[in-house]
């Protein structure tokens, strides 16, 4: 079992055969060693009990019911006075049945088997270490050809040092047929190596430090050579250099983790605990079994057949032995990763078997669904909507979610303030939704941050902390500026909310994970809290105005026609002259009174520097008054001058949307300046 206090992390890697044996082997009180699964059976069809030494054997994996052996005898678990601790008839220990969730078994393979993950997955670690083509290694593993053993001290029967399958292809057919099983074994064990055993021998003979040194020397030699002028040759050199770098990194990893390369070839195959590959009885007496059980059965069947061929039969041709070794290799490949070599294996209903890789990988795999994606207490989930009135570090929680998340804190507050005598009374007050409950809830939420997470959490900003406030409705309100860190938008995205309970988690949430403390991207350092999506659309609508310029009303024939039929009034500015305002407050007031629209053009009095106005710009139109004053109308501003050409005032042509946007920016700049002045 994994103790959460002793084990802080989980690492998946290669293990030695001795470690696999230590995991699965156990010594029962009578001194007998059990752990090897030798029979491909599961349950007896008459007694409906696990078969001995089978895939669900109670001697190997523990009892199905706590304290009850296969014979039906019962002992109290943990009672030292009860002797013996196991059944002398069936050999089953009187222990808790939960042992079947972690007690493993093993299958002793008659021939070595290459782990398909390290052979067929890209990049192929075995091919990288041996510096050989993957196709050649596959032919060797699946017994398509053989090679001569590199024995230097003794003369070989064939007097060969390298591979001979390229020169005489017919040998791989003639030699196995010529020798009988007994003679072929002597010849093969001395002269020929094939199958995964050949790969294991080559991996065992490797010196990782020499591999690193030789690869480094070759890499330097290739780097010293200049371009050849041939594009194809230059690409080959670049690919070779990249391969050498990967090979050196792989060898360093093996040395650093104390892993032997020959462990990539299996001699013992671990058997998963029965509870992780169950057989369930459904209505009608039918049984539903995990696909892994059928794949394990196939491995045991073929392995036992190979054992019989090598031990009992004396006249079996060697070719048949090699074919059976290939079948064992393919059965283990299907168990580990079905379909990695091409067409996947299917059952009688043409359904693809679910291998070990399929069980653990993907969104519905063991890790993401059961270990990483499991539901936890003090958490909730809802759709996110925009909260434009929120501060950057705040989020809005619905009352329904907040009262569930902080229910224990509210109960403690009710009892401390003597508003409830016990937990039951406090829960009844919460169910009745009394006003005092919401007051205490707000007090609790003020001092307790929450964590918001949006899947998939691909980087650090995928989960951030916020100060929660109560909102109406059933959706979580979020400030739009934090959407980029979550890669979220408001088209139906959902987010999970978690409550940090320990003091360490709360301190981390306040000091490191608050949204207003994560304004820069941890990857490249660029600002992460920038307007995106909805905010950009809103700013565009706010500042778009009318696309037609100042001459639209005068030179548009449709507007002229409408102008002639329109009744002129002081409150109608649609096709009459554009209104003038002395300040922004009057313009916004007119908008609130619905006298003008958000994008209606207007003239606003403004303190504009004369140097900003281009002196060479020609006015579009000039309006003269009876007293000699005149208005020079330009594309974006208007100047009121006297008879002596003195400037009385300047108006700019804008909209209410531009005014609102400008005021927000001005207030933000003033607030930032005040904060800087206070800091200094």
From Swiss-Prot:
Molecular function terms, GO-annotated: DNA binding; DNA-directed RNA polymerase activity; magnesium ion binding; zinc ion binding
One GO-annotated biological process of the protein: DNA-templated transcription
Keyword Chloroplast on entry: yes
Domain of life where this protein originates: Eukaryota
Residues noted as binding Zn(2+) in the record, renumbered to the chain: 69, 71, 87, 90
Note on cofactor: Binds 1 Mg(2+) ion per subunit.
Major enzyme class: transferase
Catalysed reactions, semicolon-separated: RNA(n) + a ribonucleoside 5'-triphosphate = RNA(n+1) + diphosphate
KW Chloroplast (keyword) present: yes
Enzyme Commission code: 2.7.7.6
Subcellular location as annotated: Plastid, Chloroplast
Keyword set, alphabetical order: Chloroplast, DNA-directed RNA polymerase, Magnesium, Metal-binding, Nucleotidyltransferase, Plastid, Transcription, Transferase, Zinc
Gene Ontology CC terms: chloroplast; DNA-directed RNA polymerase complex; mitochondrion
Binding site for Mg(2+): 489, 491, 493
UniProt cofactor(s): Mg(2+); Zn(2+)
Residue pairs linked by disulfide bridges in the UniProt entry: none
Main function: DNA-dependent RNA polymerase catalyzes the transcription of DNA into RNA using the four ribonucleoside triphosphates as substrates.
Family: Belongs to the RNA polymerase beta' chain family. RpoC1 subfamily.
Oligomer and partners: In plastids the minimal PEP RNA polymerase catalytic core is composed of four subunits: alpha, beta, beta', and beta''. When a (nuclear-encoded) sigma factor is associated with the core the holoenzyme is formed, which can initiate transcription.
Protein name (database record): DNA-directed RNA polymerase subunit beta'
Species for this entry: Olimarabidopsis pumila (Dwarf rocket)
């Amino acid at each position: 079992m994994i103790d959460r206090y002793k084990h802080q992390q989980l690492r998946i890697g290669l293990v030695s055969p001795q470690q696999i044996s230590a995991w699965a082997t156990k010594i029962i009180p009578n001194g007998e060693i059990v752990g090897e699964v030798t029979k491909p059976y599961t349950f007896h069809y008459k007694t409906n009990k696990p078969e001995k030494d089978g895939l669900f054997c109670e001697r190997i994996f523990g009892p199905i019911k706590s304290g009850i052996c296969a014979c039906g005898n019962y002992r109290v678990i943990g009672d030292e006075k009860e002797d013996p601790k196991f059944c002398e008839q069936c050999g089953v220990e009187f222990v808790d049945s939960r042992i079947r969730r972690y007690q493993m078994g093993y299958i002793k393979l008659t021939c070595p088997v290459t782990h398909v993950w390290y052979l067929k997955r890209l990049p192929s670690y075995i091919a990288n270490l041996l510096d050989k083509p993957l196709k050649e290694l596959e032919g060797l593993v699946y017994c398509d050809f053989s090679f001569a053993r590199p024995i230097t001290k003794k003369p070989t029967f064939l007097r060969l040092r390298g591979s001979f399958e390229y020169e005489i292809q017919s040998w791989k057919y003639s030699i196995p047929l010529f020798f009988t099983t007994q003679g072929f074994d002597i010849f093969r064990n001395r002269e020929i190596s094939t199958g995964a055993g050949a790969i294991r021998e080559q991996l065992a003979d490797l010196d990782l430090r020499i591999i690193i040194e030789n690869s480094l020397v070759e890499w330097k030699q290739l780097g010293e050579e200049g371009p050849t002028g041939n594009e194809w040759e230059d690409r080959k050199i670049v690919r070779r250099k990249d391969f050498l770098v990967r090979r050196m990194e792989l060898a360093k990893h093996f040395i650093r983790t104390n892993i032997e390369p020959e462990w990539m070839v299996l001699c013992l195959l671990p058997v998963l605990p029965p509870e992780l590959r169950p057989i369930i009885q459904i209505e009608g007496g039918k049984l539903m079994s995990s696909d892994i059980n059928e794949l394990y059965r196939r491995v045991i069947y073929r392995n036992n057949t190979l054992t019989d061929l090598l031990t009992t039969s004396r006249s079996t041709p060697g070719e048949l032995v090699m074919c059976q070794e290939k079948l064992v290799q393919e059965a283990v490949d299907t168990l580990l990763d079905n379909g990695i070599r091409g067409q996947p294996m299917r059952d009688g209903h043409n359904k693809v078997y679910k291998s070990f890789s399929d069980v653990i990988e993907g969104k519905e795999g063991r890790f993401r669904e059961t270990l990483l994606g499991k539901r936890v207490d003090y958490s909730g989930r809802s759709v996110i909507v925009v909260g434009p009135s929120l501060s950057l570090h705040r989020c809005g929680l619905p009352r329904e979610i907040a009262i569930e998340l902080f229910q224990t804190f509210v109960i403690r507050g009710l009892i401390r303030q003597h508003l409830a005598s016990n937990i039951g009374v406090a829960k009844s007050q919460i169910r009745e939704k009394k006003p005092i409950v919401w007051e205490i809830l707000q007090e609790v939420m003020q001092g307790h941050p929450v964590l918001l997470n949006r899947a998939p959490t691909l980087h650090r900003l995928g989960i951030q902390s916020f100060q929660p406030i109560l909102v109406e409705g059933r959706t979580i309100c979020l400030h739009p500026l934090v959407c980029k860190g979550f890669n979220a938008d408001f088209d139906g995205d959902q987010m999970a909310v978690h409550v940090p309970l320990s003091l360490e988690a709360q301190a981390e949430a306040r000091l490191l994970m608050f949204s207003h403390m994560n304004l820069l991207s941890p990857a490249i350092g660029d600002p992460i809290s920038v307007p995106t999506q909805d905010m950009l659309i809103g700013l565009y609508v706010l500042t778009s105005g009318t696309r037609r310029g100042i001459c639209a009303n005068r030179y548009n024939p449709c507007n002229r026609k409408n102008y002639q039929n329109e009744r002129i009034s002081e409150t109608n500015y649609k096709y009459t002259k554009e209104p003038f305002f002395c300040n922004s407050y009057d313009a916004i007031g007119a908008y609130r009174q619905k006298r003008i629209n958000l994008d209606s053009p207007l003239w606003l009095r403004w303190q504009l520097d004369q140097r900003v106005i281009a002196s060479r710009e020609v006015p579009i139109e000039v309006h003269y008054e009876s007293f000699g004053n005149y208005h020079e109308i330009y594309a974006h501003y208007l100047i009121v001058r006297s008879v002596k050409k003195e400037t009385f005032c300047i108006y700019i042509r804008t909209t209410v949307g531009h005014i609102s946007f400008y005021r927000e920016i001005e207030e933000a700049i003033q607030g930032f300046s005040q904060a800087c002045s206070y800091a200094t």
